[in-house]
């Protein structure tokens, strides 16, 4: 931290200084300009301006609050978008798996239908062959 300047100096602080310096440092004169910088502006002179500053400061505080809320909302929205993207990717993967499984099942069902038709055709052919053999044997005897 920088050293703080003393308002009133002791004799030990000024030993070795020139008389003019000592007189300027130890004199207790305070003009208005020096007091302004040491104590700050006085209240009555800057009353209306001080109200304006407070008003502007309140507006700045409100803007800061709104910006912080907006940033929080953007962060939450980003998190929700990430979750939504993950769910969307999962749904896409599930849709692809469902499509592949449905194609496989369709093929299985088609082959099952073909097998049933082939068995029915074979049974019909055997029945027809039995009937023909019976008719032929009946006429031969």
Swiss-Prot record:
A GO cellular component entry from the record: glutamatergic synapse
Pfam annotation, one family: Synaptobrevin
Keywords: Coiled coil, Golgi apparatus, Membrane, Phosphoprotein, Transmembrane, Transmembrane helix
Phosphoserine found at: 17, 30
Membrane topology: Single-pass type IV membrane protein
Transmembrane segments: 116-136
GO biological process, one term: regulation of synaptic vesicle endocytosis
Residue ranges that the UniProt entry lists as topological domain Cytoplasmic: 1-115
Disulfide bonds: none
Ranges where the record places region Disordered: 1-51
Subcellular location: Golgi apparatus, trans-Golgi network membrane
Vesicular compartment residues: 137-141
InterPro entries the UniProt entry points to: Synaptobrevin-like, V_SNARE_CC, VAMP4
v-SNARE coiled-coil homology domain residues: 52-112
General function of this protein: Involved in the pathway that functions to remove an inhibitor (probably synaptotagmin-4) of calcium-triggered exocytosis during the maturation of secretory granules. May be a marker for this sorting pathway that is critical for remodeling the secretory response of granule.
Summary of subunit composition and partner proteins: Identified in a complex containing STX6, STX12, VAMP4 and VTI1A. Interacts with BAIAP3; this interaction is increased in the presence of calcium.
Family the UniProt entry places it in: Belongs to the synaptobrevin family.
Protein name, as recorded: Vesicle-associated membrane protein 4
Source organism of this protein record: Homo sapiens (Human)
Lineage: Eukaryota, Metazoa, Chordata, Craniata, Vertebrata
Gene (UniProt): VAMP4
């Amino acid at each position: 931290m920088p050293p703080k300047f003393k308002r009133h100096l002791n004799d030990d602080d000024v030993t070795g200084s020139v008389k003019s310096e000592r007189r300027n440092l130890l004199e207790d004169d305070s003009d208005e300009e020096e007091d302004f910088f040491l104590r700050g502006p006085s209240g009555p002179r800057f009353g209306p301006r001080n109200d304006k500053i407070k008003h502007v400061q309140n507006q700045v505080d409100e803007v800061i609050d709104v910006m912080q809320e907006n940033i929080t909302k953007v962060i939450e929205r980003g998190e929700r978008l990430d979750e939504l993207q993950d769910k969307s990717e999962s749904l896409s993967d599930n849709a692809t798996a469902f499509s592949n499984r449905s194609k496989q099942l369709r093929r299985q069902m088609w082959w099952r239908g073909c097998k049933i038709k082939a068995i029915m055709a074979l049974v019909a052919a055997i029945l027809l062959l039995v009937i023909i053999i019976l008719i032929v044997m009946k006429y031969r005897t």
